[in-house]
Regions:
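Long, contiguous internal "core" modules enriched in hydrophobic/ aromatic residues
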Residues: 2-315
């Protein structure tokens, strides 16, 4: 909140936010179908639509239908909009999440490996426990607490065996510990680490000239990863956290374009990093195949610019 908002008394704030009692009642699948039809949606096969509504919640499907609305207030659909188009979008989004999640997995494992190798050679096996190597003591303290929690929750045999055998230091060495912490914790650890020379070394292994780009990208990847893990809609999502985009990079890249609020730029960061991990560029070929399988998807709504397929990164 801005300071001006923070001191608003409670009753006044209710007036600002438009607090109302929520009075919508739950409705069954037959009523859901009728409601969609009343709003102008064409349903080609009612039996299949009902089956889908029993397995995918109405609210989840509605988030794909929003894209077809003519007016947001009454939720009337544009002429010719069909339930099947929404299901297509839903299935496209689901496959897209799976591809992205798989690519992020490779980046995540690679980042862990580089942090273990590069930071340990200089700062030893327990560098992540040395507060003098980190900036912002409070944030670091919180990060270390998370590491302790995540290690104690881990069911990995190598963690259990380690704690049965050794009592000091209180955590296993970095090559064990970093394998079980979350990507969010890993990226915080990287961002809080003080030795910028080593961070630059890690960034360069990903083809990035400055560590600040890597920090920005892994923060965005953490958010994207969580969206995928929680099955959130991502195809036309607007991301609050935007990746820093260099104009030029040593490997295949894109021309500087509009503001990076949509998925396109997030995909570009994944593709760029993938070039340094798997030379066969799995994600790119899978994405191009997916776009061919769903030719009706509006790539512009995902932030894809005119002529994107001619960019060096996508060729």
């Amino acid at each position: 909140h801005h300071a001006s908002q923070r001191c608003v008394p409670r009753w006044d704030f209710a007036f600002y936010k438009g607090y109302m009692d929520y009075d919508k009642q739950p409705i069954n699948v037959d009523e859901q179908v009728a409601l969609l039809q009343n709003r102008g949606l064409v349903i080609e096969d009612i039996a299949i639509a009902k089956l889908q509504l029993r397995n995918i919640s109405y609210f989840r499907i509605a988030s794909y239908l929003r894209y077809m609305e003519e007016d947001r207030q009454f939720h009337h659909y544009k002429l010719g909009s069909t339930f099947e188009q929404a299901i297509d979008l839903y299935l496209f989004d689901k496959e897209l999440r799976q591809l992205i999640f798989k690519a992020i997995q490779d980046i995540e494992i690679s980042l862990r490996t580089k942090m273990i190798q590069i930071f340990s050679m200089e700062h030893g096996a327990f560098w992540f426990m040395d507060a003098s190597l980190f900036k912002n003591a409070d944030f670091y303290e919180g990060c270390l607490d998370n590491i302790k929690k995540e290690v104690s929750r881990s069911n990995e045999d190598f963690i259990k065996e380690h704690s049965e055998k050794y009592t000091f230091p209180s955590l296993p060495p970095v090559w064990k510990t970093l394998e079980v912490i979350s990507f969010g914790t890993l990226s915080k650890l990287f961002c809080l680490f003080k030795d910028n020379r080593l961070k630059k070394q890690v960034a360069r292994e990903f083809g990035l000239p400055q560590y600040t780009y890597l920090e920005s990208w892994i923060r965005c990847i953490t958010v994207l990863r969580n969206c995928c893990a929680h099955h959130a809609r991502i195809w036309n999502r607007r991301f609050a956290l935007k990746p820093q985009l260099p104009n030029r990079l040593p490997l295949s890249w894109i021309a500087p374009t509009q503001k990076p609020i949509k998925l396109y730029h997030q995909l570009c960061t994944l593709l760029y990093m993938e070039q340094t991990i798997t030379p066969c560029m799995d994600l790119k070929s899978s994405l191009l195949r997916l776009f061919a399988d769903y030719p009706n998807i509006d790539l512009h709504a995902m932030g894809f610019p005119q002529g994107w397929e001619n960019e060096p990164l996508w060729r």
